[in-house]
Amino acid sequence: MSGGGEQPDILSVGILVKERWKVLRKIGGGGFGEIYDALDMLTRENVALKVESAQQPKQVLKMEVAVLKKLQGKDHVCRFIGCGRNDRFNYVVMQLQGRNLADLRRSQSRGTFTISTTLRLGKQILESIESIHSVGFLHRDIKPSNFAMGRFPSTCRKCFMLDFGLARQFTNSCGDVRPPRAVAGFRGTVRYASINAHRNREMGRHDDLWSLFYMLVEFVVGQLPWRKIKDKEQVGSIKERYDHRLMLKHLPPEFSTFLDHISSLDYFTKPDYQLLTSVFDNSIKTFGVIESDPFDWEKSGTDGSLTTTTTSATPQLHTRLTPAAIGIANATPIPGDLLRENTDEVFPDEQLSDGENGIPVGVSPDKLPGSLGHPRPQEKDVWEEMDINKNKIKLGICKAATEEENSHGQVNGILNAPSLGSPIRVRSEITQPDRDVPLVRKLRSIHSFELEKRLTLEPKPDTDKFLETCMEKMQKDSSAGKEPVPPALPHKPCVPVVTHTDHIWHYDDEYLPDASKPASANTPEQADGGGSNGFIAVNLSSCKQEVDSKEWVIVDKEQDLQDFRTNEVLGHKTTGSPSDEEPEVLQVLEGSPQDEKIQVGPWTDNHHLKKESSGVVLALSAECPATAASELYTDRLDLQAGAASQFITVTPTSPMEAQAEGPLTAITIPRPSVASTQSTSGSFHYGPQPEKKDLQPLEPTVELYSPRENFSGLVVTEGELASGGSRVDLGLQIDHTGHDMLPNMRDGDTSQDLGPKDPPDHNRLAVKEFEHLPGETEERSLLLGSENEDERLSKGQHCIEVSSPGELVTAERAQLAATEPLHVSETQNCSVLPNQDKTHEIMKLLAVGTSEISPQAIDPHAEGQIGQMAAMQKNKLFKDDGIQSESLPRQQGDLSAFLHQEGKREKVVPRNGELYHCVSENEHGPPTRKDMLRSSFVTRHSRIPVLAQEIDSTFESSSAISAKEKLLQKKAYQPEIVKLLVEKRQFKSFLGDLSSASDKLIEEKLAAVPVPFSEEEVFAPFSRLAADSHLSRSVEDSFLSPIISQARKSKIPRPVSWVSTDQINGSASPQFLPRPPPGKPPVRPGVEARLRRYKVLGSSNSDSDLFSRLAQILQNGSQKSRSTTQCKSPGSPHNPKTPPKSPVVPRRSPSASPRSSSLPRTSSSSPSRAGRPHHDQRSSSPHLGRSKSPPSHSGSSSSRRSCQQEHCKPSKNGPKGSGSLHHHSTSSKTPPGKSKPASKLSR
């Protein structure tokens, strides 16, 4: 075939494709494909292996497969043996033929054929053309090099049509001729192309006949009038001007009829094949040609052509790839025409697949891998006999010996290497034909064994199933001693290959008669290979598969497309017909690539699909034990590892998903690795516990990541699920995932729980990563958050504003996920919270809060201010906490019950919280620097990561506001002041107030929940809570003064916050004076009680429960409690369901949805709102005002925050802390400075 520049060979000698076909030598090649002589290890026969790069834009093999299968059983058509594809190339295996006619003609001494040979060849070519037309296809590249003589004595006198890469279906499903395109583009080879082709007109059946006419003239004359002209336009003009009757002088007189007839045909007219055949018959009679006469090349000793080295088994495949094989070197691309014309419109179900690579047609079921007998005795290659170099074939095989062994580590070469459909090199000893027999036997036995294994696999029509199978295999491999998840990554390369390779559904020999998806028996070996190779041979049938193997479950188009999509590169691989303009009937192939693209997402897409459809990933995490989650993650990790880049490319199906995926996509991939690692370490324990420890030191990081990434995944899931499914499910799923991960992390490393204790590991790791990540991440996440959030918020906010609260939640979640890892972590913590119901509510609240948090994330300064405000409010909160604790104690019984539940949840959460603390600390580190620069004037509190404290303080600040409001409500002057201040700031910093209020509530809850944060406690379920509370206290301590000063300094008016700040300073400062190191904050029973109460409130299974209990607690505890309850009642609907709040959220989101969404999530807990009825009111409007920075803390998210605070205390710490609290923790001064800019920004 002509065309195309030299490129390195796709395959090398000795390579084993699909563990079945061993490459012996390259026969030909061109721009878009290569042809190899290969040895079928099953049948021991030589076959033609046609390969095209998976990356090349023009893919023709799928069309070739489609047409070749359609033509099976026709004379003059090669037997189809198999096909497939992997990440590197697509391939088709067919019967190997002898030399092509162009080669044979040139081999003649005169470069011409005799009339006898020409007439007999012409008649066979006409028959082959009629055959392809009979199935509704045009060849469109009729030329001597696309016809070859058979290799064996039985077929050496039969001419076979080759290369259907440029074929086009000219009939529709009804069998009617398709309407021609006005401009079709040039197809074919310039020398033999018809005038219509040169005119870019739609080619019809008569155009193939015109090409035949030119061939006949060339056979007889040795050349055409335009022989030396290469330019298509010039040749076209010559053809138009040339009197074709002049050509007849070289042909028998009867051919005038042939010329007249084809000249009279048009696109719609069916040629009279019988008439044309009669022309040949009459001419044969006229010239006295006998069918049995030897062809010119068979005449021994007449010319050296017989012994030309090129004859050595030169397959039917031309020494030169035809334009079709090359991708139509001579075709003129017409926009939209090239990619789709051929294959896309062929068969919707037609796809390159190894699934069909079964037993060759000639092979009986008995002669499968298990059987030693060859399907049929190999006939001697007549061409080899004529070729002095006939043995030359064996030479090339001997190359890759040790190299193969070393590179593949294959003891058995073919068997052991997970070729995943990728070529495997055969040991040199195997290379020689004589040695192939034992190898074949071994292969057969192995394949039989593998086939059995494979047969045990579920039918793989589903990509998901395929992925699951791969994951199982991966897991098995990893458990077998492959490496833990990280090794899985190395293994992952295989996995991606597997995805592709697996996606190489083997359609074997058999072409199903109309089968859109021909399925042919897959040899056990193949089936086996499919399983082992990663090729998902969907063959469900027994080892002895029928040629017609309809049992082969051919993956659906979409699934196949997913297969291609597994690597988006593959997705690009999807072969497009030459013309995009016209969908062609043979669209299957194109679809399959797209499907593969979908699979590219197998991880992400499937993950998303699973999330969307059933939250499978999360759901699995939730539904399945941690192990399942980790398995899923691990599997996905494996899949993702290879497909990570591809997965990243996966496009979100919805704006929310896009938002979630935007940053999350990247995160998603990391998450699988890290998250998987975590979950894996915890659940699978792939590696030794030490590895778990490693993971765990990483786990803080991982959790940091996983909070981000996992949570990002969760968030993505939330966003996606929220968009696609129920957020509640997400919440549950996330919780389960969190639980799974947390338990895994716990199992893997208590140090994670000890995060504070192991700060060296977690904090250091977290710090390192978070300094990198926080600074980078926070900044990046802020950048991402800000950019992504801004973009998303631009999208998400718009969506939030426009969309329903639920959507807001989704968008916010996505935003949150994208906004900050901390926020993500925060959300994740919330998600991870054991209490699913609460988690759902929280998730909802978080979703709402997320929108708030996201805005916050966008504006770190705003976050800082918010954090400061929150801290100030927290101080108030502590004062209020004192009050509330008094009033709440009454309710404590109920709260304790809730706390017990929530404590359990928080047991899980604290770890995340710890991670978040670490993350917050780490994140705080970089932001803190900024903050320190910004707020160096602010008093520095202990630099010890008071993140939890800060977070707690933030929570408390919000809680304090709620409590404060309660106190204010109790004390008329306070409520009045608060109201006045709130009213003033409703427009500016109402969100800040809300966030403060929610922060107070949250902190109160945190204080109650965290209690002491000791290593023991860290290990203990409540230890996490204690840690959170302790951290929150420390943070509060560090935050209070700076935050108060900053808050006071901050221009964001916070009436409640100001009052609360004073109160907080008064009451909280003593409480926070200790500022214990992050490792072990002092235990504060009172604070813990308050936190627990709020926690209980926040963690209530349902908003109604939460609100009712809060109401009871608050009412019983104090008027403030009542007001809190009241606020919660309205707020809770806002928070979880957020109907009222949703408007608020949009308001917040528009102004500060990024930040506010990040903080609001934590602060948005319904309790904080409950704490502040007026805040509820404000939260709808004030959120708008304050959502800019503090609002994010206060906003409607505040109510969420309070609930989330309990669950997400760490997470809240993460986001808030990261934004402001963390800065404070690093340097409380810094946060204030930051908070000021934040408040300015918010304003």
UniProtKB/Swiss-Prot annotation:
It catalyses: L-seryl-[protein] + ATP = O-phospho-L-seryl-[protein] + ADP + H(+); L-threonyl-[protein] + ATP = O-phospho-L-threonyl-[protein] + ADP + H(+). Residues 674-683, 1115-1129 have a biased composition (Polar residues). Residues 674-695, 737-761, 1063-1086, 1115-1243 are annotated as: Disordered. Residues 1073-1084 have a biased composition (Pro residues). The active site is at residue 141. Residues 1144-1170, 1187-1202, 1227-1243 have a biased composition (Low complexity). ATP binds at residues 27-35, 50. GO terms for biological process: cerebellar granular layer development; cerebellar granule cell precursor tangential migration; cerebellum development; cilium assembly; embryonic brain development; embryonic digit morphogenesis; forebrain development; microtubule cytoskeleton organization. It is found in: Cell projection, Cilium; Cytoplasm, Cytoskeleton, Cilium basal body; Cytoplasm, Cytoskeleton, Microtubule organizing center, Centrosome, Centriole; Cytoplasm, Cytosol. GO terms for cellular component: centriole; ciliary basal body; ciliary base; ciliary transition zone; cytosol; nucleus. Interacts with CEP164. Interacts with MCRS1; the interaction is required for recruitment of TTBK2 to the mother centriole. Serine/threonine kinase that acts as a key regulator of ciliogenesis: controls the initiation of ciliogenesis by binding to the distal end of the basal body and promoting the removal of CCP110, which caps the mother centriole, leading to the recruitment of IFT proteins, which build the ciliary axoneme. Has some substrate preference for proteins that are already phosphorylated on a Tyr residue at the +2 position relative to the phosphorylation site. Able to phosphorylate tau on serines in vitro. This is Tau-tubulin kinase 2. It comes from Mus musculus (Mouse).
